Amino acid sequence: MKRTYQPSNVSRKRTHGFLVRMSTKNGRLVIKRRRAKGRKNLAVSIASK
């Protein structure tokens, strides 16, 4: 049986990325909560050159 987590940077960004979060009201609430908590990473971001 295949494992459930098959990592892919593309699908990760498309589902949990910053722009996706900002596109809905609830997503903005997520970012707001994480800012208030003092998270270093507000949303998933893939390091690129």
From Swiss-Prot:
Keywords: Ribonucleoprotein, Ribosomal protein. One of its GO terms (biological process) is translation. GO terms for molecular function: structural constituent of ribosome. GO terms for cellular component: ribonucleoprotein complex; ribosome. It holds the Pfam family Ribosomal_L34. PROSITE patterns: RIBOSOMAL_L34. InterPro entries: Ribosomal_bL34, Ribosomal_bL34_CS. Disulfide bonds: none annotated. The keyword Nucleotide-binding does not apply. The keyword Ribosomal protein applies. Belongs to the bacterial ribosomal protein bL34 family. This is Large ribosomal subunit protein bL34. It comes from Geotalea uraniireducens (strain Rf4). The lineage of its organism: Bacteria, Pseudomonadati, Thermodesulfobacteriota, Desulfuromonadia, Geobacterales. The gene is rpmH.
